[in-house]
Amino acid sequence: MEFTEEAIVLMMLGALLGVCIVSRALDGAGLLAAAAIGSIIGFLGHWTWLSLLIFFLLSASIATRWRYEEKKRLGFAEANDGSRGWKNAVANGGAPAIAVLLHDAMGSPGWGAIALSCSVAVAMSDTLASEIGVMDSRTRSIVSLRVVPTGANGGMSPTGMLSSVVGSLILAIAALGLMADDFVWSGLGAVVIISVAGWAGCQVDSILGETLENRGYLGKHSVNFLATSFGALVGYASFYVI
C-alpha cells in the first residue's frame, strides 16, 4: 500500500469515528471496536473496502433512528438511545475483518472483496429487516409459518422481508460502485451474487434466532456473527465456483 492510500485510510477512520461520535451511532467501546475493525479492513484490504463498511454503518444508524421513539415505546428499540456497543460492532464487522485477515494471510488471491461485500450485505439486510420490519405486526415464524409476536426471534413480516431484499440490493450496488475493479464478474453478476448472499444470510439469521437463540444456545450477537460469517463463506465459494 502506498503512503497516499495509508493516509486516505487514516482520514477515513478519523471521519468514521467523528461521525459516530456526533451521531451517537456507537458508544465508547463500540468506537474502539469499530476503529480496530476498520483498521484491519482499510490497511490489509483497501480504503474502498473500508468505505463500504462506513456506508453500512451510516445506513444502519439511519435505520435505527427511524421512528425510534415509537419503537422505544413498543419495546423494540436499541438500548442506550440507539447507540450500539462493541458487541454489535464485532457481530456485524468481525466476520468481514476476519475475511480480510485471511485473504491477506493467503497472499491476496482475489476473493477478499466479494467475501467482504457478501458479509456486509448480510448485516445490511438483517439490520433493515429488523429496524423497519419490526413496525409490521403481520409476523409469522420463518420455520413453522405460524403467527408469532411482533419482534420475536425468527419472526418475519412482509415489510421486513421487503426491507431485507432492498437492504442487500442497496449494499450490492454500493459495493459495485466502490469496488468494481476488485470483482471478477460483470456489474450485474456481482450485484446478483452480493444481494442474494445478503438476503440469504438474513434468513439464516432468522432461522438461527428461532431454533438456537430462543432455546438459549446462542445470543443475539452470536447469531449475527454466524450469519455474517455465512455471507463471507458464500462470497468465498462464489469466487471459485461461479
Regions found by a protein language model. Name each.
Residues M1-A129, G133-I242:
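Hydrophobic alpha-helical transmembrane segments
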